[in-house]
């Protein structure tokens, strides 16, 4: 049977939605299992049908689905797949969400707004998820939204080690694109033994995806600056931050982010930016128009596979990141 790995009395089965099958196959390969064959299609009116081709009874099931565009469709498919596993008598259901949709809606900025990140967690729990495994949440408090264990994985080791191997560390400055990412940037500084700078920005709450950059805090003149963020969506924030760094005398700018959302005008902005390299992981598929020489995509599959193995074998996911 495909997708089964047995340890003693335990049985692992690995499932994938249709959002990012390449990542699913790579994770399954690292685990030494196959992806369980699944029949999935859309009805004429847009409803989604799912049926697994093998029994999941008594199995520890791991279901991977990244929330890429069209995001609402893939979230709904994931919920349907969770429900199908629950009704198929799965022993446990671990939902792997490399990119957690709606994570930016993690609190009410103003009255009469939803907390959509909490809603996503509630929907997964109601559908039947026992555990969530995700990568670089937009904010840490989202871990508390789900009524069950949440394994929060980090791409920092992959991204930082890649940059550290390419750049003369004596010239390197780690830059946070805003005050909210300073703690993550600090961990980069510790890993690369580099100083920290911050780009101060203000966002117009009434205009989506519009950012005004004001000032750079820290010395970036003549330095190779590494901008670190969790995601890049339209590219407005990060490209404006890069422009501010160049205006303050930076020699070069490299941008790193775990999640390359890359919506709307992102393609043109990244192509036309003075940034020498954009580095992402493959938590999300990269659009074809963004397969550029200046874009590097690193594999997150080993990190996810190692975490899945620890969960299945009742090990420690935390131990995978102790060196941070």
Swiss-Prot record:
Residues involved in Mg(2+) 2 binding: 178
Domain of life: Bacteria
InterPro entries reported in the protein's UniProt record: PRib_PP_synth_CS, Pribosyltran_N, PRibTrfase_dom, PRTase-like, Rib-P_diPkinase, Rib-P_diPkinase_bac
Cellular location(s): Cytoplasm
BP GO annotations: 5-phosphoribose 1-diphosphate biosynthetic process; purine nucleotide biosynthetic process; ribonucleoside monophosphate biosynthetic process
Top EC class of this enzyme: transferase
Positions annotated to bind Mg(2+) 1: 138
SUPFAM superfamilies reported for this sequence: PRTase-like
Subunit structure: Homohexamer.
Record protein name field: Ribose-phosphate pyrophosphokinase
């Amino acid at each position: 049977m495909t997708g089964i790995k047995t340890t003693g009395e335990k049985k692992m089965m690995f499932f994938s939605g249709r959002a990012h099958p390449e990542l699913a196959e790579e994770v399954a390969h690292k685990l030494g299992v196959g992806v369980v064959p699944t029949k999935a299609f859309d009805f004429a009116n847009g409803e989604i049908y799912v049926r697994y081709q093998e029994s999941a009874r008594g199995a520890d099931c791991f279901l991977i689905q990244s929330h890429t565009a069209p995001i609402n469709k893939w979230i709904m498919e994931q919920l349907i797949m969770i429900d199908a596993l629950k009704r198929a008598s799965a022993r446990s259901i671990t939902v792997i969400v490399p990119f957690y949709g709606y994570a930016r809606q993690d609190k009410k900025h103003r009255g009469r707004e939803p907390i959509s990140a909490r809603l996503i967690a509630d929907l997964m729990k109601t559908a039947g998820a026992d555990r969530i495994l995700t990568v670089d949440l937009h904010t840490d408090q989202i871990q508390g939204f789900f009524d069950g264990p949440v394994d929060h994985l980090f791409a920092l080791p992959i991204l930082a080690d890649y940059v550290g191997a390419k750049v003369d560390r004596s010239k390197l400055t780690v830059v946070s694109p805003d005050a909210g990412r300073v703690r993550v940037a600090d961990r980069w500084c510790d890993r690369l033994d580099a100083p920290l700078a911050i780009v101060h920005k203000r966002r117009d709450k009434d205009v989506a995806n519009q950012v005004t950059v004001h000032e750079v805090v820290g010395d970036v003149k003549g330095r190779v600056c590494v901008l670190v963020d969790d995601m890049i969506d339209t590219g407005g924030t990060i490209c404006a931050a890069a422009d501010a760094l160049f205006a303050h005398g930076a020699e070069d700018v490299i941008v790193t982010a775990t999640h390359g959302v890359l919506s709307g005008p992102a393609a043109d902005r990244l192509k036309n930016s003075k940034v020498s390299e954009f580095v992402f992981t493959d938590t999300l598929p990269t659009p074809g128009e963004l397969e550029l020489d200046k874009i590097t995509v690193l594999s997150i599959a080993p990190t996810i596979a190692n975490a899945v193995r620890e969960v299945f074998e009742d090990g420690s996911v935390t131990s995978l990141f102790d060196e941070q």
